[in-house]
Amino acid sequence: MNARDVMTRDVVSVASDTPMRKIAALLVEKRISGVPVIDGSGAPIGMVSEGDLIGRSEAEREARQDWWLTTLAEGEAVNPEFLASLSYPTARDMMSAPVISIDEKTSLGEIAGILTEHRIKRVPVVCDGRIVGIVSRADLVRALVARPHIPAV
């Protein structure tokens, strides 16, 4: 069996400028634990997971915001709405990158190895630079359960 046999084809993805608040709502609504972040051509550029939503400390967020405020405010008039938006992180701010991906022909054994080696829970399936599916650990477990029992010799 390969990725194409077990992958979820209806992939929920987000753009890099999607606010994290919207991503959190999407994860809850769709009952998923992570989404690929795609560029304008549909190519994966990162992943955002539940861990990214809760794993960043307040100090990290404040340090990032302070850096941007200092950089932008030095001698330049800055749009107040833009400054306010800096307190709302986007997918670009929080995603894990670069994205690790596979193709449709990747075997289930290889996928399991990739998930284990990189300590990730899902991997996008890419064809011609675009996401065509996603394989999660749950997909691998379903495939394992669906296999016919082979009696011991």
Predicted features along the sequence, with ranges:
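Tandem CBS (Cystathionine beta-synthase) repeat/Bateman regulatory domains
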Residues: 1-153
